[in-house]
């Protein structure tokens, strides 16, 4: 019975660590995606203008 209590306590600590570490990681990832998409568009446009200026 003593081993079961230790295992239960370890499982509770493990779950609390996972829950507390998962919440902050979700917010920056959600905020990083629109920034990555917004920064990709001007690079594509600049690349197109460079290609057109080389042709003309």
Curated annotation (Swiss-Prot):
Consequence recorded when altering residue 44 to T = Complete loss of potency
Asked if the Swiss-Prot or TrEMBL record annotates the protein with the keyword Transcription regulation, the reply is no
**What outcome is documented for mutating residue 50 to N in this protein?**
Complete loss of potency
Give the modified residues of type Leucine amide: 55
Recorded consequence of changing residue 49 to Y? Complete loss of potency
Asked if DNA damage is a keyword of the record, the answer is no
Q: What is the effect of changing residue 48 to S?
A: Complete loss of potency
What subcellular locations does the record give?
A: Secreted
Cysteines joined through disulfide linkages: none
One cellular component term (GO) for this entry is: host cell presynaptic membrane
- Maturation-removed propeptide residues: 23-42
Outcome of mutating residue 43 to K: 5-fold increase in potency and similar order of inhibition potency on different Nav isoforms. No change in potency. 3-fold increase in potency. 3-fold increase in potency
Reported effect, residue 51 to N:
2-fold decrease in potency
Where is it mainly found? Answer: secreted
Q: What is the effect of changing residue 44 to F?
A: Complete loss of potency
Keywords, in A-Z order: Amidation, Ion channel impairing toxin, Neurotoxin, Presynaptic neurotoxin, Secreted, Signal, Toxin, Voltage-gated sodium channel impairing toxin
The domain of life is Eukaryota
Give any GO molecular function from the UniProt entry: sodium channel regulator activity
Q: Extra notes?
A: Negative results: does not or very slightly inactivate hNav1.4/SCN4A and hNav1.5/SCN5A sodium channels.
Q: What is this protein called?
A: Alpha-pompilidotoxin
From what organism does this protein derive? Anoplius samariensis (Solitary wasp)
């Amino acid at each position: 019975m003593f081993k079961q209590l230790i295992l239960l306590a370890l499982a509770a600590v493990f779950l609390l660590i996972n829950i507390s570490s998962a919440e902050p990681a979700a917010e920056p990832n959600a905020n990083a995606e629109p920034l990555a998409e917004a920064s990709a568009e001007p690079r594509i446009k600049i690349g197109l203008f460079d290609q057109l200026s080389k042709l003309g």
